Amino acid sequence: AATRFAHAASDQNDAIAGMIRVTASRAFASFLLPDTFADFSKSQPEIKVDLVVTDETVNLLMREADIAVGMFRPTQQVNLISKKIGELELAAFAAIDYLARRGTPRSLTDLQGHDIIGQDAQGGPQEELRAMGVPIGPNFFRFNCDDQTVTWQMIVAGCGIGLGHLRLGMSDPRVQRVLPEIPIIKVPVWLTAQAELNANVRLKTVFDFLSNSLSGKLA
């Protein structure tokens, strides 16, 4: 593990060429980072990126990565610099063919007659939905999934209704937003880097690019 997560940023703070290690959750890396890094490779051909995709916490203080993209601001701010770059908007979606088979729900109570895909996690979107009046009970979910990427694939496949990234869903012709009266759930997204951010040219170049690019894809 120590070898896998060796600190990537060079000690030569003024050198643009070299490696930067970026960590992100599987869902964030799958949905938002490929296009971002495609653009990055065109503008910064000398910088290599090691993308660490994990839903586990990566310790920047222990130099396991140079930059982290995540839904939580690190609680230990010593020797780290964090910036809120936007909010990830979540809304309810279902596949077009699923709605053709089962009908489109017109109210929150209609959800009880549908197959709902839940996220197997404490708190988070499910608690917010319950607070909005969504009738979440013991038998509310037909499916539970602990992976947001797979959850989205299940929605697209027609397994049922579930939460997905608003911008992604609105641009996908295979799905349709349902119950738009349910308020959009907004999850803050943070970009965090080592404290030497402003002194390391390569680190700052990647950080600034991610900040500018991802903020345009978030709310």
Where are the regions that the model predicts?
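Amphipathic alpha-helical segments that line or abut small-molecule/effector binding pockets
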Residues: 3, 26, 30-42, 96, ...
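Central regulatory/effector-binding core of bacterial HTH transcription factors
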Residues: 17-77
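Short, well-ordered beta-strand segments
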Residues: 21-23, 68, 117, 162, ...
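A late-sequence structural motif
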Residues: 181-219
